[in-house]
Each structure stands twice: as structure tokens, then as C-alpha cells.
């Protein structure tokens, strides 16, 4: 690399609009502003650890699919994940990374690691619905990652041209509903839905959502071995798992050694009168029906206790109750497209869905708060 090229490499990062030189970050909290908020302090502390060569890191799961847990990851695991993503998207020195995920969880943490490992310019903003509201209008980026809620807000705010100047965009942390997937088709920048978890140091597979060849299946990244257990749930083994076999609760259709279709979580199966109903299958039909009625309501499906059936299939919708006529139209569409035992027996309207700190839908909390 020439001297002129080296001069273009980053020696600082931007956090909420303020510049922090790496030499100062390595000495954090010395030489730091006294008015940092808690989030900024925690981000800088992780950056300090990474830049100073720490070998172990404690990561926290979001709790969206169970009780939040702490997971110890080695530097080698995080480096392997960053290297795999960097190679796949050809991320290189001097390119620009926007980090707007919560950096207290693996999605945001791995964005930081990728930027450090690939020597990319790093702009970090505190998570909010429209991250572009926090960066200058003239700022452009090459790579970023959003949760679906953010991408929905960004498109609604008219920021598609800014997205289209990027090399690629990741979307993860929650399912992408049909309405958002339709809106993504307007983008020329490649958009990928990620599959992964804290225990795999973020994603191990990607699904292209737009462009000439969108696909309903996930493609496993090079060097990752996948299989299935006796339940049909995905197993994962690779350097990011310390070569230990991890068994997930995600039911998949494994098409070959590198491709799978995600069917739903084993723990989201509703046992209604002895008939097992996969909640995510009903959700897909529900989302399509809402789209046909011109509704942008967020929704999900889960089981609720029922004296006769044990569990009944229930559809939870965000916002005020729909007019009776629309509810009848929705139920009619569901009745046409779902099996007898799959049809939601009730529509439950919740003013606002609960989310975790990492931006994921918190189903359990939402169900508990529902009327």
C-alpha cells in the first residue's frame, strides 16, 4: 500500500457526530468528554477492548426467543465472522461503514469488528427508527445493517437514493414482513436478510431479497457446516462456534449442504387440540391478507391458553381495533387460505408491540400485555 493510500485509512471514528481518535479510545476513559451518555460510554469501552487486543468478550442475547443469556466469545471467533462477511462483500480499507444497530448486542458489535478488521471509516449513531436523521445529508456510506423497523422508516422518509449509493445492505434481527419485502424491490442496492445468532457471532447464512435473483432460501457462507437434528432443526459447526456443534430451534428444509429454507421455530409450534400449527406459516398468510386489504399493520401469530384446545391460534395486530367490516374481510381471507385448524380463532389488538433493546419483537412481553 502506498503512502498516499495509507494516509486515507481511518485513525478515528465518529460516534453520535463526535470524532474520537483511536489513540484516545485506547486510553478510554482518560481524555474522554465528561458528557458521554451511557450508550456512548459502553460503545467506547468495547472499542477500547478491541483496539487493545482483548482476547475474550461477553456478549448478551436479546431474549427475543427465550431468557436473555451471557455468551463468552473469543477474539478469534469474532475475527473469523468478520473475515467471512468482509470477503463475501469485498469490504476494503477506506470504505465507509454506518453502524446504527445496538452495539450492546452481537449485530452492532460485529459491525464494529468488521470496520476495525477491514480498516473502514466508522460512523456510529445511537439506534433509532431513522438513523439518517442523525447524520449529515451529504454523508454517504458503502455498507450498513438495519433491523426491519429501521429500513421501513428509512424508505418511508424518502432515503432510497442514499441506500442505492451503497455496496450492500444487511437486514436482520427480526422477520421481514411481506409489505416491507415488496417495498425493498424499489432498491437497486443488494439487500440481504441474515440468519444467525449470538452463539455464531452473527450471521452464517444470507438470503437475497431483491434484484434479478431474489430467493426464498438462505445460502450458507463458505466454511460453515450445517445439518439437521431429529426434529428437523438446523445444526451449525464452524470456526465461529469453536468447531463445536450448535443445535438451534429453527426448523428448516435442508436442500443441500449449502442451502436451506427456514420453516419456523420449533418452540413457536402451537398445539391446538392435538394439531400442531407452525405460527410462522400462518403469519405469512396473515401478512398477505393485510396487504390485500391495504393495511400496514404489524402482526404475528402465537398460541393462547384455551380450556378446550389447550392452545388456540391467535393473531396479534398492532394498533387500534379494525372496524368490524374489515375484521370480517380479514377473517374471510384467512379462512380461504388456511387449513381448518390454522385459522386464528381471535384477533387481538395491542396498542404497541413490545421490543427488546436490540430492536427485535418481544413476543412474550407483547402477549402478556395484550387484553
Which sequence ranges carry the predicted segments?
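AMP-binding/adenylate-forming
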Residues: 74-80, 96-153
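AMP-binding/adenylate-forming catalytic core of the ANL superfamily
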Residues: 249-341
Amino acid at each position: 500500500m502506498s503512502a498516499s493510500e495509507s494516509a486515507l485509512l481511518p485513525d478515528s471514528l465518529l460516534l453520535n457526530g463526535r470524532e474520537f481518535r483511536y489513540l484516545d479510545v485506547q486510553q478510554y476513559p482518560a481524555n474522554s468528554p465528561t458528557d458521554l451518555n451511557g450508550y456512548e460510554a459502553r460503545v467506547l469501552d468495547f472499542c477500547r477492548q478491541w483496539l487493545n487486543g482483548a482476547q475474550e468478550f461477553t456478549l448478551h442475547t436479546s431474549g427475543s426467543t427465550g431468557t436473555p443469556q451471557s455468551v463468552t466469545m473469543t477474539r478469534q471467533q469474532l475475527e473469523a465472522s468478520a473475515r467471512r462477511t468482509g470477503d463475501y462483500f469485498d469490504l476494503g480499507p477506506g470504505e465507509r461503514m454506518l453502524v446504527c444497530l445496538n452495539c450492546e448486542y452481537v449485530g452492532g458489535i460485529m459491525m464494529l469488528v468488521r470496520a476495525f478488521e477491514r480498516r473502514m471509516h466508522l460512523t456510529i449513531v445511537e439506534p433509532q427508527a431513522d438513523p439518517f436523521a442523525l447524520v449529515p445529508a451529504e454523508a454517504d456510506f458503502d455498507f450498513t445493517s438495519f433491523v426491519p423497523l429501521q429500513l421501513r422508516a428509512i424508505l418511508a422518509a424518502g432515503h432510497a437514493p442514499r441506500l442505492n449509493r451503497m455496496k450492500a445492505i444487511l437486514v436482520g434481527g427480526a422477520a421481514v414482513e411481506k409489505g416491507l419485502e415488496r417495498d425493498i424491490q424499489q432498491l437497486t442496492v443488494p439487500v440481504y436478510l441474515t440468519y444467525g445468532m449470538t452463539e455464531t457471532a452473527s450471521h452464517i447464512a444470507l438470503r437475497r431479497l431483491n434484484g434479478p435473483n431474489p430467493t426464498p432460501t438462505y445460502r450458507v457462507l463458505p466454511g460453515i457446516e450445517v445439518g439437521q437434528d431429529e426434529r428437523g432443526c438446523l445444526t451449525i459447526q464452524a470456526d465461529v462456534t469453536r468447531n463445536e456443534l450448535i443445535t438451534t430451534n429453527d426448523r428448516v428444509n435442508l436442500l443441500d449442504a449449502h442451502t436451506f429454507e427456514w420453516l419456523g421455530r420449533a418452540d413457536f409450534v402451537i398445539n391446538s387440540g392435538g394439531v400442531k400449527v407452525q405460527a410462522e406459516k400462518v403469519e405469512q398468510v396473515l401478512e398477505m391478507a393485510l396487504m390485500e386489504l391495504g393495511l400496514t399493520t404489524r402482526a404475528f401469530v402465537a398460541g393462547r391458553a384455551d380450556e378446550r384446545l389447550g392452545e388456540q391460534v391467535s393473531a396479534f395486530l398492532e394498533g387500534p381495533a379494525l372496524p368490524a367490516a374489515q375484521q370480517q374481510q380479514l377473517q374471510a381471507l384467512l379462512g380461504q387460505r388456511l387449513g381448518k385448524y390454522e385459522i386464528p380463532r381471535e384477533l387481538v389488538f395491542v396498542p404497541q408491540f413490545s421490543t427488546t433493546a436490540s430492536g427485535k419483537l418481544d413476543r412474550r412481553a407483547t402477549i402478556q400485555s395484550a387484553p
